[in-house]
């Protein structure tokens, strides 16, 4: 009977210790997932919705890995410096650009977001060989949804897969004929 009591005590101690360690691991994982979502939230607020381009680019240096890769409908963009050029170009084209996160879910090293992008196209959008001609400035306000998956490594954004409704945005701007689904000349806002 004494042996049974000792074994039972040992089993209880191990179970309590395991449960405590398991709870600690769950809390640690939850905290990491929340930090990852905070990184993505900060990117929306301080990079994409920041009207001060220089400030946005400084924050990008803090939030993105130097070898960051963006995968979107035009192909892949490699490196933070190329991504920062895209951020600056986007701000020049649409000075009032804003990306508002609507939902975020984190799992492992990834964060998935659903957001609403808005802005007024004040300058021409450069041609993308094989995808689109030069799109003249229309001065029209557009809003469109985006879905994105972000991979985070060591507290920084390492990779993004972006799924934006670019066709819808271009239709709103008057740059695509919605019946033919082809680019059309647009009246410039100059």
Spans of features found by a protein language model:
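Short helix-onset patch at the extreme N-terminus, typifying the N->h transition
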Residues: 6-8, 118
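C-terminal and inter-domain tail/linker signature
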Residues: 17-190
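Positively charged n-region of N-terminal signal peptides that target proteins for export
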Residues: 1-4
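Hydrophobic membrane-insertion alpha-helices, especially the h-region
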Residues: 9-17
């Amino acid at each position: 009977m004494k042996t049974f009591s000792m074994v039972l005590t040992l089993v209880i101690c191990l179970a309590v210790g395991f449960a405590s360690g398991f709870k600690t691991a769950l809390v640690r994982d939850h905290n990491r997932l929340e930090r990852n979502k905070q990184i993505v939230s900060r990117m929306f607020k301080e990079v994409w919705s920041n009207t001060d381009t220089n400030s946005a680019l400084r924050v990008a240096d803090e939030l993105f890995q130097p070898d960051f890769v963006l995968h979107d409908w035009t192909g892949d963009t490699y490196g933070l410096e190329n991504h920062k050029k895209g951020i600056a170009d986007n701000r020049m084209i649409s000075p009032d650009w804003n990306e508002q996160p609507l939902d975020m879910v984190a799992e492992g090293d990834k964060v998935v977001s659903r957001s609403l992008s808005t802005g007024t196209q004040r300058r021409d959008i450069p041609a993308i060989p094989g995808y689109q001609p030069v799109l003249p400035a229309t001065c029209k306000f557009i809003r469109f949804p985006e879905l994105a998956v972000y991979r985070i490594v060591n507290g920084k954004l390492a990779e993004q897969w972006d799924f934006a409704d670019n066709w819808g945005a271009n239709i709103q701007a008057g740059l695509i004929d919605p019946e033919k689904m082809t680019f059309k000349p647009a009246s410039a806002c100059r």
